[in-house]
From Swiss-Prot:
It catalyses: a 1,2-diacyl-sn-glycero-3-phospho-L-serine + H(+) = a 1,2-diacyl-sn-glycero-3-phosphoethanolamine + CO2. It is a peripheral membrane protein. It comes from the Bacteria. This is Phosphatidylserine decarboxylase proenzyme. HAMAP family: PS_decarb_PSD_B_type1. Disulfide bonds: none annotated. The lineage of its organism: Bacteria, Pseudomonadati, Pseudomonadota, Gammaproteobacteria, Alteromonadales. Heterodimer of a large membrane-associated beta subunit and a small pyruvoyl-containing alpha subunit. GO terms for cellular component: plasma membrane. The gene is psd. InterPro entries: PS_Dcarbxylase, PSD-B, PSD_type1_pro.
Length: 289
């Protein structure tokens, strides 16, 4: 059965399906939208008690529901000094060292940091011998993405690609999954060096947004688009630890890359299969940096 599911991933018109789902998710279709939201909540056991607006009827579109805000204070930031916090609610897929420019996707599967970042070897070299973490956001999860550490935006890269589903089954069976799927890369300058936050698209992920650019929708095609931003002066964009940096309209995966020696140790519980909550302790920073 798993082999059939993987085969369907290759032959399904994923971009077409995603566009159609995106149109429906954005539509304000009244009773139809409400019925689908109610079904989704029941099917995926969404905890609406955490939402700032807990009444499903308050959401005019499925996108409004899916990108819902949480109640104030429901995800308090860990206040310890010298740490990073979890950027999302989700589950740790993999984490560990970046060795010889390779990142672990699943047992026996690796992909390159160069490919993940859109082919720029200079960008990838900034993370040589650093660390990575991959976090999967399930349908029930809160789908806004926050900063694990204060950072100043220096670059954004849009990388076109496939839209394979992103889940443990495809991670085990689709080579180079995260470096093949459509994605948006945001690179920040932090107190411990560069941080890359890679927002990976997937089947039926209608769009990816950032707080500075809105929905990232370059023209269709195979071209990689890059935007560079000032890191000093009045035009620099600095986002504080815990601030929202983006969101998925329908969910997927976040891959983070850290510079060499940025992280001293990962926090307890930051292991494959463990669930995460935005704002909890993620890692101890290297105090020597």
């Amino acid at each position: 059965m798993d082999s059939v599911k993987i085969a369907l991933q290759y032959i399904m018109p994923k971009h077409l399906v995603s566009r159609l789902v995106g149109k429906f998710a954005a539509a304000k279709a009244g009773a139809l939208t409400q019925a689908f939201i109610n079904w989704f909540i029941k099917q995926y056991k969404v905890d609406m008690s955490e939402a700032a607006q807990s009444d499903p009827k308050a959401y005019a579109s499925f996108n409004d529901f899916f990108t819902r805000a949480l109640k104030d204070g429901i995800r308090p930031l860990c206040q310890e000094d010298g740490i990073m916090v979890h950027p999302v609610d989700g589950a740790v897929s993999q984490r560990g060292p970046i060795e010889a420019g390779q990142i672990v996707q699943a047992k026996g599967h690796h992909y390159s940091s160069v490919a993940l970042l859109g082919g720029d070897e200079k960008d990838a070299a900034r993370f040589d011998n650093g660390d990575f973490a991959t976090i999967y956001l399930a349908p029930k999860d809160y789908h806004r993405i926050h900063m694990p550490i204060t950072g100043t935006l220096s670059k954004m890269i849009y990388v076109p690609g496939e839209l394979f589903s992103v889940n443990p089954l495809t991670a085990q069976n689709v080579p180079g999954l995260f470096a093949r799927n459509e994605r948006v890369v945001a690179i920040f300058e932090t107190q411990v060096g560069p941080l890359a936050m890679v927002l990976v698209g997937a089947t039926i992920v209608a769009s990816i947004e950032t707080v500075w650019a809105g929905t990232v929708t370059p023209p269709a095609g195979k071209q990689v688009f890059t935007w560079e931003y000032p890191t000093t002066g009045s035009d620099a964009l600095t986002l504080e630890k815990g601030a929202e940096m983006g969101r998925f309209k329908l969910g997927s995966t976040v891959v983070m890359l850290f510079a060499q020696d940025a992280i001293d140790t990962f926090a307890a519980g930051v292991d494959p299969g463990e669930t995460t909550r935005m704002g909890q302790k993620f890692a101890n920073l290297n105090k020597s940096k």
